[in-house]
């Protein structure tokens, strides 16, 4: 019942009658009252009803009280009192519990309403209770507003305060207002504002409050709609939408999607077009991209600007042979640009410029055709073949078309319709055309494929239409606006290029209908006259003159492909209805107008069978006639398939765009074919389609019979007893050639019945051979399919979906280069078989391939899950739609319901849990970059059923932590070979040679760091690779799509500022220094570092450097560049020298500049004194020179007046002024760095006093003024309370140091090295934080200063100090004491032994020092002791207590010999009750003395300090004597020679001479000369081992006992001692190391000669032992002939039953590997070693030997730094997999492991490159890879990682050695000329190589 029919509530005479209140009548009303949609009302007033209706909580019935007699209705009039009196009685009040008497017929007392009437006008009912209204009008009811207890007002459900009694304010609405609002429910009352975060009530019909636009009218002209949001505009005019232009935040204007500044609200300037302009152009998108635009004398040109011409002109600069003409062109166009010449003027200039340059005109036309589909033609004659070269449609004038025809030697075939014909077209009467011309309509055609149309003269239109006054009138709402002027004449030429489609376009004013002929086989249209001049339309007598001349195929040979690809069209003549409805058709880009339904499937086609032209107005008004289209029956319309979309607009049907042709790529996943009339239950098809769609499968459902099928992976054919596809033969014929699976479904019949009922399908093959059809029917029954007879349809559908998913998931995977391994690793983490709910996070930088990997995983495993949900670009979706909407969409997909059914506020947790716990779900959340994006999902994910998996991708690792993801997988970048696959050479192959291309490719790959998105961008960029390579090297700003937009996405202000600072200034700088500066700038550095690392934008290297990938750094710099592309002075950060120079010289700096880093190399210019005055926000200033030897820079001839007070960093090398500016306030300065400056004082006069007395230096932490030669003193630093670092090295004019330095409690580092005029040092006892103090070179410093006890490193070399006070013992934390070249130092206190933490003591050059203190105390930590060039003549006995000593240098200053060192690298604590004491033993008779000692037993290893003796400048191998070892018992005090052995001459100054001279006399005993004494001595030895002499036979056996084992030794080849004598007997010593062939031990002969031998087990060789021994012995025989200073000499072999022994020269310093493990090797040391290795390799290669095993472990070092190649030549007889040599193997060795003749000396060069890399980095190449991966990488040519921190020469040397092609590697002789090998050595004062060993 409607509102107008509502009646007041009355009591009927029926006993229990009920009546519905006014309010509840509205609830029950279907069309009015309160809406049944829950979205229109406040949820607080909703109850849990299944329909979602709002049910009132008050009673909806009014019932007569019990016991009350039924009475007739109370009526008005004079009989009212009588009725009441008659009904009154002595009855009690009917209210329960009331004992009062009833007042009247109401049955109630006065207190309960008896006797009182309702106060509602015209209401005669009794009041209810104590209220003044009856029950129907609110009496007795309470306000339903939440929490309100007042009575309802009137017939409403609310009190007066909450809307009761008030009416809706919406226009003529008479409903009651809802709640506190001024509107009813229908018009917004009770609803909440939908603005995110707003909780106010909606105001007006839209769900927005007044603050957000509710109730406001649109402010756009005469619009009557309601405003949306805060915009003040309705949705039609852009309200609630933002401008789509990037970085624009203004509201969109109208439907354009753009603000007014970017084109919104403006109309297209094309004649006849009423659409809005697109962007900043003057035309809509359709006029720019859909049809060609006009260029004529009227100046109507579509969007071509002077800038377009300038861009093209600059691009073709090289094509101008005359540079002056190019300059003229450029000057003309620039004048046009600056003078603001209009479009017509620009066109005129362009035509003049391109005269005589047809090639440039053609190129410019091609450029414009691609951008705007516009073509400019010259005014004069032009070649006929020009039209064939122009791409796309073009336009020309009528005169130009005549020129084309004349050049083609053709006469135009012209038909001129008479005026009567035109009149007949207007009136609709049939007329026969004549040949008389009419000026109102001119149509010409020719056979050259060009159609020329001249518009009719402008005709006046009706007022409702368009006024024809020569201007384009546009209608906007109720207003008409005068537009642009029509051109006086317009000729349009369309180059169609297809003989099957001839088109005549209507005139721009819409007065001519468009006629289209479609003929697949070039047949004549139906009902066409034989003369070809007139076409009569079917069903109508109306005729229109048109062109029917056929176009020859030869004229369109270039378009042959297009002709073949055209779809067959039905042979009919159609007319396009050109009306305003065409504006609603879809544009070519797929956009649809508002309100139009965007359908996935094409609508049914409709055939036009009759065209009638109806008269719209009287003919005398000269109005236009519109064609009205009439159709046949629906069945015939449905069967129409002419390739075009037909849309219905009211009663009209309009021909739309053609259907898209199916491309060669897959268009659909599944196509379903069925007969619509044959399926009795259409629900089966709909359920099947819905099930497929829920699994993310694209489905094309087709019941019409068409020949062409879209490409698909699965084709489902539903076969019935009466249906089979008409193209079944075609389907089966292409079944084996197409990648498609066909599944037949036999619907309600078996396959047997299907074949038996073949007679029912005769109608399909009446025209074909029955045998083929019978075979086809039989074949389809044998194909895998489904039969639906008694089976449940739901089960069958599930089975079909599963099989379809298997087929789709087995499709060809995307070519993911380098991702397969990572996909498998993630799948192993997912553990699909497990039943737990597991989540995986995929983490990596932007563009690394996270989404691609997730999609591939989804493709692989989605078939195993019941429900799969993929949310792509989740962060963006949340930003656009909001959290609630995204979660509702997510739940709708998981629960498989429609999105509008789910409401977050309505759904219950228990319902979710119960539904989801029964599902096995796969969820992929892509691009989750904020925890808040998935915060609402987290609880839902916990409800998933067993076996569910959640995969989340993000750039932010912290998201995974907050979301409590089980496993996080970091995506790895591509390696070099796979990265190179993504780079496309393109045109570079023509220009670049393979070598140059390879070099550039590697540079680009290094820049990309294996990021696929960056590599794809670099491969597609159109810049030359040479220029691009230079940009990459200098990390210039580069815009990388996708990377640029997402780099700063999600960064807060702190992280963004740190990110840009590092990208521009601080990349690969020490983290602590960067953090110090950033903290001083107000950033939270460590928090920002952590955030950037989590977001994959930054890494912290193992050397504590902040490291940013090159492409991310380039992107960050591009962000800064785009702050102001044209004005560098408006950017926040400057680092480019050219830009900075421009800013300095032209004084264009602004307050926007925050940082300047200028490399002054090759720069020299003058700047004005106030160059920094405008840069008030400058906080980082660094002027430096990258090459120290080049001194250039900025000079200030007039001085410097200003520096910004906000500076945190002032780094200025070669500062040219004597002091800082007076106006400079350093209150914010964190680092002051002025090395090599001309400053004499930092501040002058009052400024100096101000800085020292105030807290202006409170933030200063680092001050460096090194090598400032003119600096005489530094100011007081008492205010710099946070100063931590002071560097005054090289300030040789500095006279004194201020006493204020003692107040610097936080000072850690103080360097005064080279301050030669400094005499006194203030007390530093109170510097409690001081750790490093360097006073070296303070040559006038004579007193030992008072130093803080916390100092760890003290350098005092080169001073005048004579003695070290005993108070040095107070420096309990001292680790290093350097007193080198302290020539006046005479003695050291014994208290020096109390320095328990001292590790290094350098006394080299202390020539006055005569003795080293002797003490029984142990210095357990001392590892290095340098006593060279001192006057110490004898080592104290306490030297043996230095148990941790690794190296001891000792030189006799009088005789310049010898040096004593201890090379052991490691030491451990002595076991209890064990001791170690060094002893020196010898024989004074013949000076044969050895250094001996007891064995030191330690935990885990056995070690004995070894003393190496150097006798001259070079090292003689025979002079090396080693001590100790794994020999049981003590060695004899004197090792004697056998009488038969040859005794070599002992030169003076040799080892023996040295030990004899320095050893204590008591340790030297006379030797025994008789053999008997020697034998007796040996027999009484307690070692358990015996020296057994070998006889004269070839072999001899002897036994060596060691524990419980014994073995017999037999000599197989002569073993030579160091002096050429035979070794007749020997003893095994300590283990030196283990190699690939066996273990290496120290050996000692009976004559005291030490050597090394390799013990190789013969048992490992099996049955091939004998053959293998022969090969080894033959190799050793050859190797023993080699004599070179850089090659370890082989001395011979011997063997026993189980082992082979190979004897070699003993080199005692150890291998290069042990050396770099102990010390970091510098470039100069590695260069020295490399040159010696090359010397040895050259010698070997010249002799025809190949080392085959070059690595640091096989390169031994002597005490003087001489290297010797060892362990070579034997790799040939070893298996590849048995040796760990693969880290250094060359690719050809990997590829041919057993073909030793397949590679040669270049293999050694590759190994040498790896060895040099190992020495420089301290890491074995490929050590981070497994052996299989490493071998694969080497075999494929992937180089090991080469750090960027290496020098250029070192990198070049390594890359030169690591050429993949062996033929490209240089020889060892060629490498000896490389700059890296010839690097000069550092100076060494002592002449010792120990300094080199320390690097």
From Swiss-Prot:
ATP binds at residues 844-851, 1632-1640, 1654. Residues 28-39, 75-85, 418-427 have a biased composition (Low complexity). Residues 1-85, 408-442, 517-538, 580-620, 1562-1583 are annotated as: Disordered. GO terms for cellular component: chloroplast envelope; nucleus. The keyword Nucleotide-binding applies. Residues 462-526, 635-700 bind DNA. GO terms for biological process: defense response; signal transduction. Residues 1626-1877 form the Protein kinase domain. InterPro entries: Disease_R_plants (IPR044974), Kinase-like_dom_sf (IPR011009), Leu-rich_rpt_3 (IPR011713), LRR_dom_sf (IPR032675), NB-ARC (IPR002182), P-loop_NTPase (IPR027417), PAH (IPR003822), PAH_sf (IPR036600). Keywords: ATP-binding, DNA-binding, Kinase, Leucine-rich repeat, Nucleotide-binding, Nucleus, Plant defense, Repeat, Serine/threonine-protein kinase, Transcription, Transcription regulation, Transferase. Residues 291-371 form the PAH domain. One of its GO terms (molecular function) is ATP binding. It comes from the Eukaryota. Gene3D superfamilies: P-loop containing nucleotide triphosphate hydrolases, Paired amphipathic helix, Ribonuclease Inhibitor, Toll/interleukin-1 receptor homology (TIR) domain, Transferase(Phosphotransferase) domain 1, WRKY domain. The active site is at 1758. Residues 10-22, 46-62, 408-417, 428-442 have a biased composition (Polar residues). Its main location: nucleus. Pfam families: LRR_13, LRR_3, NB-ARC, PAH, Pkinase, WHD_ROQ1, WRKY, Zf_WRKY19. Transcription factor. Interacts specifically with the W box (5'-(T)TGAC[CT]-3'), a frequently occurring elicitor-responsive cis-acting element. May act also as a disease resistance protein with a serine/threonine-protein kinase activity. This is Probable WRKY transcription factor 19. It comes from Arabidopsis thaliana. The lineage of its organism: Eukaryota, Viridiplantae, Streptophyta, Embryophyta, Tracheophyta. The gene is WRKY19.
């Amino acid at each position: 019942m409607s509102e107008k029919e509502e009646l007041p509530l009355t009591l009927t005479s029926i006993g229990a009658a009920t009546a519905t209140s006014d309010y509840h009548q509205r609830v029950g009303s279907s069309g009015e009252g309160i809406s049944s949609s829950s979205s229109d009302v406040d949820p607080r007033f909703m109850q849990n009803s299944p329909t979602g209706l709002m049910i009132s909580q008050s009673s909806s019935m009014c019932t007569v009280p019990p016991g009350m007699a039924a009475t007739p209705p109370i009526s008005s009039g004079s009989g009212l009192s009588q009725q009441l009196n008659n009904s009154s009685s002595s009855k009690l009040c009917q209210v329960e519990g009331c004992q009062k008497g009833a007042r009247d017929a109401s049955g109630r007392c006065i207190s309960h309403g008896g006797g009182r009437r309702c106060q509602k006008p015209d209401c005669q009912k009794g009041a209810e209770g104590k209220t003044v209204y009856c029950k129907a009008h609110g009496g007795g009811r309470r306000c339903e507003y939440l929490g309100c207890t007042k009575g309802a007002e009137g017939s409403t459900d609310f009190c007066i305060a909450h809307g009761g009694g008030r009416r809706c304010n919406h226009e003529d609405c008479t409903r009651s207002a809802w709640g506190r609002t001024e509107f009813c429910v229908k018009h917004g009352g009770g609803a909440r504002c939908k603005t995110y975060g707003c909780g106010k009530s909606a105001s007006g019909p839209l769900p927005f409050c007044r603050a957000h636009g509710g109730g406001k009218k649109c402010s756009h002209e005469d619009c009557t709609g309601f405003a949306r949001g805060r915009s003040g505009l309705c949705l039609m005019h852009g309200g609630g939408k933002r401008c789509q232009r990037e970085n624009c935040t203004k509201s969109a204007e109208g439907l354009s999607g753009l603000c007014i500044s970017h084109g919104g609200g403006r109309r297209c300037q094309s004649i006849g077009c009423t659409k809005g302009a697109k962007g900043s152009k003057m035309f809509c998108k359709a006029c720019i991209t859909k049809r060609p635009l006009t260029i004529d004398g009227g100046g109507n040109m579509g969007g071509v600007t002077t800038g377009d011409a300038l861009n093209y002109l600059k691009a073709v600069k090289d094509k101008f042979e005359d540079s002056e003409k190019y300059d003229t062109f450029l000057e003309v166009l620039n004048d046009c640009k600056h003078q603001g010449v209009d479009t017509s003027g620009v066109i005129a200039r362009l035509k003049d410029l391109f005269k005589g340059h047809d090639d440039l005109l053609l190129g410019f036309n091609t450029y414009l055709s691609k951008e705007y589909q516009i073509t400019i033609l010259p005014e004069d004659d032009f070649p006929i073949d020009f039209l064939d070269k122009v791409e796309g449609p073009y336009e020309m004038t009528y005169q130009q078309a005549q020129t084309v025809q004349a050049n083609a030697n053709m006469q135009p075939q012209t038909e001129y319709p008479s005026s009567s014909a035109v009149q007949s077209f207007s009136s609709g009467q049939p007329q026969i055309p004549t040949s008389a011309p009419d000026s109102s309509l001119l149509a010409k055609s020719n056979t050259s494929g060009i159609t020329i149309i001249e518009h009719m003269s402008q005709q006046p239109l009706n007022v409702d239409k368009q006024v024809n006054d020569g201007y384009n009138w546009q209608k906007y709402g109720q207003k008409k606006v005068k537009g642009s002027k029509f051109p006086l004449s317009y000729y349009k030429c369309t180059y169609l290029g297809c003989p099957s489609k001839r088109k005549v376009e209507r005139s721009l004013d819409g007065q001519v209908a468009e006629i289209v002929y479609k003929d697949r086989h070039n047949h004549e249209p139906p009902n066409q006259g034989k003369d070809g001049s007139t076409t009569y339309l079917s069903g109508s007598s109306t005729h229109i003159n048109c062109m029917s001349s056929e176009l020859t195929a030869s004229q369109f040979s270039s378009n042959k492909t297009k002709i073949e690809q055209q779809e067959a069209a039905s042979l009919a003549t159609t007319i396009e209805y050109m009306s305003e409805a065409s504006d609603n058709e879809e544009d070519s880009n797929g956009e649809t107008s508002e309100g139009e339904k965007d359908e996935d499937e094409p609508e049914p086609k409709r055939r036009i069978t009759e065209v009638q032209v109806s008269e719209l107005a009287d003919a005398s008004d000269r109005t236009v006639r519109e064609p009205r289209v009439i159709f046949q029956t629906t069945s015939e319309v449905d069967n129409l398939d002419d390739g075009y979309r037909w849309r219905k607009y009211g009663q009209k049907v309009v021909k739309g765009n053609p259907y898209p042709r199916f491309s060669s790529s897959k268009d659909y996943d599944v196509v379903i074919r069925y007969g619509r009339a044959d399926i009795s239950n259409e629900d089966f098809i709909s359920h099947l389609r819905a099930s497929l769609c829920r699994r993310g499968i694209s489905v094309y459902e087709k019941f019409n019979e068409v020949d062409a099928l879209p490409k698909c992976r699965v084709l489902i054919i539903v076969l019935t007893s009466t249906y089979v596809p008409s193209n079944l033969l075609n389907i089966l014929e292409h079944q084996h050639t197409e990648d498609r699976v066909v599944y037949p479904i036999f619907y309600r019949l078996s396959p047997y019945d299907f074949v038996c009922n073949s007679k029912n399908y005769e109608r399909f093959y009446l025209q074909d051979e029955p045998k083929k059809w019978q075979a086809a029917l039989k074949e389809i029954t044998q194909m895998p399919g489904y039969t639906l007879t008694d089976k449940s349809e739901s089960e069958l559908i599930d089975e079909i979906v599963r099989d379809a998913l298997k087929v789709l998931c087995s499709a060809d995977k995307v070519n993911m280069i380098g991702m397969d391994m990572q996909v498998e690793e993630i799948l192993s983490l997912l553990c699909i078989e497990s039943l737990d709910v597991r989540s995986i996070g995929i983490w990596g930088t932007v563009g690394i391939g996270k989404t691609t990997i997730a999609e591939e995983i989804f493709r692989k495993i989605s078939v195993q899950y019941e429900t799969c949900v993929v949310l792509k670009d989740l962060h963006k979706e949340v930003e656009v739609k909001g959290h609630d909407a995204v979660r509702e969409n997510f739940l709708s997909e998981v629960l498989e319901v429609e999105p509008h059914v789910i409401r977050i506020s309505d759904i219950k947790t228990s319902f979710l849990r119960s539904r989801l716990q029964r599902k096995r779900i796969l969820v992929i959340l892509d691009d989750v970059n904020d925890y808040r994006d998935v915060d609402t999902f987290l609880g839902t994910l916990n409800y998933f059923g067993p076996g569910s998996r959640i995969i989340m991708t993000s750039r932010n690792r912290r998201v995974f932590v907050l979301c409590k993801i089980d496993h996080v997988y970091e995506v790895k970048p591509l390696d070099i070979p796979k990265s190179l696959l993504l780079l496309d050479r393109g045109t570079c192959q023509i220009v670049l040679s393979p070598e140059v291309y390879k070099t550039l490719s590697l540079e680009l790959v290094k820049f990309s760091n294996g990021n696929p998105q960056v590599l794809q961008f670099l491969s597609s960029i159109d810049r030359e690779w040479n220029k691009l390579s230079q940009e990459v090297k200098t990390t210039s700003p580069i815009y990388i799509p996708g990377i640029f937009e997402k780099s700063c996405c999600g960064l807060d202000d702190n992280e963004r500022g740190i990110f840009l600072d590092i990208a521009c200034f601080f990349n690969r700088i020490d983290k602590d220094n960067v953090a110090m500066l950033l903290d001083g700038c107000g950033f939270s550095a460590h928090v920002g570092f952590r955030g950037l690392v989590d977001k994959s934008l930054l890494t912290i290297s193992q050397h504590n450097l902040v490291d940013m990938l090159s492409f991310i750094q380039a992107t960050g710099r591009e962000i800064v560049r785009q702050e102001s592309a044209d004005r560098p002075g408006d950017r926040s950060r400057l680092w480019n020298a050219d830009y900075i120079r421009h800013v300095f010289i032209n004084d264009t700096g602004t307050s926007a500049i925050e940082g300047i880093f200028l490399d002054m190399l090759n720069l020299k210019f003058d700047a004005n004194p106030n160059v920094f005055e405008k840069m008030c926000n400058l906080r980082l200033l660094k002027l430096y020179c990258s090459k120290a030897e080049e001194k250039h820079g900025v000079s200030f001839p007039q001085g410097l007046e200003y520096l910004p007070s906000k500076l945190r960093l002032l780094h200025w090398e070669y500062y040219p002024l004597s002091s800082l500016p007076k106006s400079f306030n350093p209150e914010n300065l964190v680092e002051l760095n002025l090395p090599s400056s001309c400053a004499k004082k930092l501040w002058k006069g009052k400024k100096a006093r101000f800085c020292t007395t105030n807290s202006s230096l409170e933030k200063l932490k680092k001050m460096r003024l090194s090598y400032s030669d003119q600096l005489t003193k530094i100011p007081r630093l008492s205010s710099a309370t946070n100063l931590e670092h002071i560097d005054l090295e090289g300030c040789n004019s500095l006279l004194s140091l201020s006493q204020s330095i003692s107040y610097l409690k936080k000072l850690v580092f103080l360097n005064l090295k080279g301050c030669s005029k400094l005499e006194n040092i203030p007390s530093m006892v109170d510097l409690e934080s001081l750790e490093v103090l360097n006073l070296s070179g303070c040559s006038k410093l004579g007193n030992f200063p008072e130093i803080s006890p916390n100092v760890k490193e003290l350098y005092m070399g080169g001073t005048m100090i004579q003695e070290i006070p005993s108070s040095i013992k107070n420096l309990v934390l001292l680790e290093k004491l350097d007193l080198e070249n302290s020539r006046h130092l005479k003695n050291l206190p014994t208290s020096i032994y109390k320095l328990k933490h001292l590790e290094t003591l350098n006394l080299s050059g202390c020539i006055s020092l005569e003795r080293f203190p002797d003490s029984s105390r142990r210095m357990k930590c001392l590892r290095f002791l340098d006593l060279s060039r001192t006057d110490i003549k004898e080592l104290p006995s306490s030297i043996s207590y230095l148990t941790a000593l690794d190296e001891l240098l000792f030189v006799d200053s009088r005789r310049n010999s010898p040096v004593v060192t201890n090379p052991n690298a490691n030491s451990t604590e002595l076991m209890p009750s064990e001791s170690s004491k060094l002893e020196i033993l010898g024989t004074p008779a013949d000076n044969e003395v050895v250094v001996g000692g007891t064995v030191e037993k330690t935990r885990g290893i056995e070690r004995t300090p070894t003393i190496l003796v150097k006798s001259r400048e070079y090292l003689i191998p025979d002079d090396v004597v080693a001590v100790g070892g794994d020999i049981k018992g003590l060695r004899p005090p004197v090792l004697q020679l056998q009488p038969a052995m040859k005794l070599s001459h002992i030169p003076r100054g040799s080892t023996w001479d040295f030990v004899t001279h320095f050893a204590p006399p008591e340790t030297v005993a006379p030797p025994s000369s008789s053999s008997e004494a020697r034998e007796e001595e040996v027999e009484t030895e307690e070692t358990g081992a015996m020296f057994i002499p070998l006889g004269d036979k070839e072999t001899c056996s002897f036994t060596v006992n060691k524990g419980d084992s014994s073995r017999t030794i037999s000599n197989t080849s002569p073993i030579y001692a160091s002096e050429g004598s035979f070794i007749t007997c020997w003893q095994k010593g300590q283990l030196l190391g283990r190699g690939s062939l066996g273990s290496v031990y120290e050996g000692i002969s009976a004559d005291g000669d030490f050597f090394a031998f390799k013990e190789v087990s013969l048992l490992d060789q099996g049955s091939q032992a004998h053959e293998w021994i022969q090969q080894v012995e033959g190799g050793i025989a050859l190797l023993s002939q080699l004599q070179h200073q850089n090659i370890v000499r082989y001395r011979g072999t011997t063997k026993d039953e189980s082992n082979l022994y190979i004897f070699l020269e003993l080199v005692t310093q150890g291998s290069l590997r042990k050396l770099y493990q102990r010390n970091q090797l510098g470039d100069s040391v590695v260069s020295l070693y490399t040159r010696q290795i090359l010397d040895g390799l050259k010698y070997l290669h010249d002799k025809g030997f190949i080392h085959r095993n070059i690595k640091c472990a096989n390169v031994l070092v002597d005490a003087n730094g001489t290297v010797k190649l060892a362990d070579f030549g034997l790799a040939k007889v070893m298996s590849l997999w048995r040796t760990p040599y693969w880290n250094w193997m060359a690719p050809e060795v990997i590829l041919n492991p057993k073909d030793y003749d397949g590679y040669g000396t270049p293999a050694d060069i590759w190994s040498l490159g790896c060895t040099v890399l190992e020495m420089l980095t301290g890491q074995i190449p490929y050590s981070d890879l497994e052996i299989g991966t490493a071998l694969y990488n080497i075999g494929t040519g992937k180089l090991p990682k080469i750090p960027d921190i290496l020098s250029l020469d070192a990198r070049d040397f390594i890359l030169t050695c690591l050429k993949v092609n062996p033929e490209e590697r240089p020889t060892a002789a060629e490498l000896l000329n490389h700059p890296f090998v010839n690097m000069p050595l550092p100076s060494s004062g002592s002449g010792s190589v120990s300094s080199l060993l320390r690097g």
